[in-house]
Regions:
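TRAFAC-class small GTPase G-domain
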Residues: 1-175
């Protein structure tokens, strides 16, 4: 499929929140129980045809969440069209790290569209409520917040499609 649009999208957030699992679910439709820790960054591509009829190539940059790799993120952000910042809804400490991820991305990529992603909805003991994350997303000038689960495939494809549509919208505004 030849793509009308090609977008570089950063996927960032604390270690262990499920960034790689979300990308794997979206790109291949599968969920692996055993994920190896991402070292630096991994790159995946997904070609999609949106319900609008447009062909989009999503270049997904899965960035390691561990503190020791964070200094690299600024370089990976350059040229990004959009970003997902992920947190684990069962671990409040990952939600508390959102301001740092936002700062790094905005300092290096500007005011690109960002979607906050609360992953692991399939698990019990949610420590972050949807309304809290929605308020944070609004105050941080993010496009939206999405609660999802890579494991049970809840809201994964819709959040990536929403990002693609927003990126096309903003690209058309810039023309």
């Amino acid at each position: 499929m030849s793509s009308n649009w090609i977008f570089k999208v950063i996927v960032a957030g604390a270690g262990g929140v499920g960034k790689t699992a979300l990308i794997e679910r979206y790109v291949s439709g599968s969920f692996l129980e055993d994920h190896k820790m991402t070292i630096g960054a991994q790159f995946s591509v997904k070609d999609v045809k949106l319900d609008t009829g447009e062909d989009v190539r999503m270049q997904l940059w899965d960035f390691a969440g561990e503190e020791r790799f964070r200094f690299l993120l600024g370089d990976y952000c350059k040229g990004a069209s959009g970003a997902f910042i992920c947190f684990d809804i069962t671990d409040y400490s990952t939600f508390e790290q959102l301001p740092e991820w936002l700062r790094i991305i905005r300092e290096n990529a500007g005011m690109i569209p960002i979607i906050l992603v609360g992953n692991k909805y399939d698990l019990e003991n949610h420590e972050i409520e949807l309304a809290t994350a929605d308020d944070y997303a609004e105050n941080a000038k993010c496009l939206m917040n999405v609660f999802c689960s890579a494991k049970i495939d809840l809201n994964v494809e819709p959040m990536f499609s929403a990002m693609a549509k927003w990126l096309i919208y903003y690209a058309n505004l810039a023309d």
